[in-house]
C-alpha cells in the first residue's frame, strides 16, 4: 500500500489545530473590551474602569472586575501594581478616581521590603487594561486637558480688533 499525501496533510492539519488551541492567552484583548462596553451610559460622559482590590495579578483583576459604571465624581482609571524585583506581581489594585489621586504616578522602590510599586492613571472607557511595570508605563495619560479654563479673555478682544481692521473699520 502506497502512502497517501491527503492523509498526511489531514494528520498534519489536525496536529497544528490542537497546538493552536493549547496556546490561548490569559489576557484580555481590545476585542474583548469592545464586547464588554455597551453603547449606552447612565449619564453623559459615563465610563468604566477595571476595578479590584489587591488581586494576585492582572488576569485575576480583569477577569473578576465588576461590570459597573464609575461614579460621577470620578474621571480617571487608576492602577497600582506592586511587584517583586523579578517583575512577578504581588498585588494589583484598580479603581475609578478623581484627578487628585492621579497627580503622583510613577514607580518607587521599597528598599526595606524589596519590591517596587508602579502607579498609572488613564482617561477613557476601560483604559486600565495593562499594568505599569516601569517608568515608561507608569504615566498619567489623558485625552482632554487637565486644566480646562475658558481661554484667555484678551484673545477675544484681539480677534475682534483684527476683524475690525480687516474689514476697514475703526474702533
Curated annotation (Swiss-Prot):
Q: Where is the UPAR/Ly6 domain?
A: 47-141
Pro-peptide positions? 148-171
Q: Keywords of this protein's UniProt record, alphabetized?
A: Cell membrane, Cell projection, Cytoplasm, Disulfide bond, Glycoprotein, GPI-anchor, Lipoprotein, Membrane, Secreted, Signal, Synapse, Synaptosome
Its subcellular locations are: Secreted; Cytoplasm; Cell membrane; Synapse, Synaptosome
A Pfam family this chain is assigned to: UPAR_LY6_2
**InterPro entries in the record, alphabetically?**
LYPD6-like, Snake_toxin-like_sf
Query: Which Cys residues form disulphide pairs?
Result: 49-77, 52-61, 70-96, 102-121, 107-118, 122-127
Q: Where is this chain primarily localised?
A: secreted
Q: What does the entry give for GO biological process?
A: hippocampal interneuron differentiation; nervous system development; neuron differentiation; pyramidal neuron differentiation; regulation of synaptic plasticity; visual perception
- Give yes or no: UniProt keyword Glycoprotein: yes
Q: In which tissues is it expressed?
A: Detected in the frontal cortex and hippocampus (at protein level). Highly expressed in the brain and spinal cord, as well as dorsal root and trigeminal ganglia.
Give the UniProt entry's GO cellular component terms. cytoplasm; dendrite; extracellular region; membrane raft; perikaryon; plasma membrane; side of membrane; synapse
Short motif NxI motif, span? 88-90
Which positions are glycosylated? 134, 147
Against Gene3D superfamilies, the record matches this protein to: CD59
The positions making up the signal sequence are 1-25
**Assembly description:** Interacts with nicotinic acetylcholine receptors (nAChRs) including CHRNA3, CHRNA4, CHRNA5, CHRNA6, CHRNA7, CHRNB2 and CHRNB4. Interacts (via NxI motif) with LRP6.
What is this protein's function? Acts as a modulator of nicotinic acetylcholine receptors (nAChRs) function in the brain. Inhibits nicotine-induced Ca(2+) influx through nAChRs. In vitro, specifically inhibits alpha-3:beta-4 and alpha-7 nAChR currents in an allosteric manner. Acts as a positive regulator of Wnt/beta-catenin signaling.
Q: Which PANTHER family match?
A: LY6/PLAUR DOMAIN-CONTAINING PROTEIN 6, LY6_PLAUR DOMAIN-CONTAINING PROTEIN 6
Query: Know anything about its domains from the record?
Result: The UPAR/Ly6 domain is sufficient for inhibiting alpha-3:beta-4 and alpha-7-dependent nAChR currents.
Q: What is this protein called?
A: Ly6/PLAUR domain-containing protein 6
- Please tell me the species this chain comes from: Mus musculus (Mouse)
**What gene makes this protein?**
Lypd6
Amino acid at each position: 500500500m502506497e502512502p497517501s499525501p491527503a492523509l498526511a496533510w489531514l494528520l498534519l492539519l489536525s496536529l497544528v489545530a490542537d497546538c493552536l488551541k493549547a496556546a490561548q492567552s490569559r489576557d484580555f484583548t481590545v476585542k474583548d473590551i469592545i464586547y464588554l462596553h455597551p453603547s449606552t451610559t447612565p449619564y453623559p460622559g459615563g465610563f468604566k474602569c477595571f476595578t479590584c482590590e489587591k488581586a494576585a495579578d492582572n488576569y485575576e483583576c480583569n477577569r473578576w472586575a465588576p461590570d459597573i459604571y464609575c461614579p460621577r465624581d470620578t474621571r480617571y482609571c487608576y492602577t497600582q501594581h506592586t511587584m517583586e524585583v523579578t517583575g512577578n506581581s504581588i498585588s494589583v489594585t484598580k479603581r475609578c478616581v478623581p484627578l487628585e489621586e492621579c497627580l503622583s504616578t510613577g514607580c518607587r522602590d521599597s528598599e526595606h521590603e524589596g519590591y517596587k510599586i508602579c502607579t498609572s492613571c488613564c482617561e477613557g472607557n476601560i483604559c486600565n487594561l495593562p499594568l505599569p511595570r516601569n517608568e515608561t508605563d507608569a504615566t498619567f495619560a489623558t485625552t482632554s486637558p487637565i486644566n480646562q479654563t475658558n481661554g484667555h479673555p484678551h484673545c477675544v478682544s484681539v480677534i475682534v480688533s483684527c476683524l475690525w481692521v480687516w474689514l476697514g473699520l475703526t474702533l
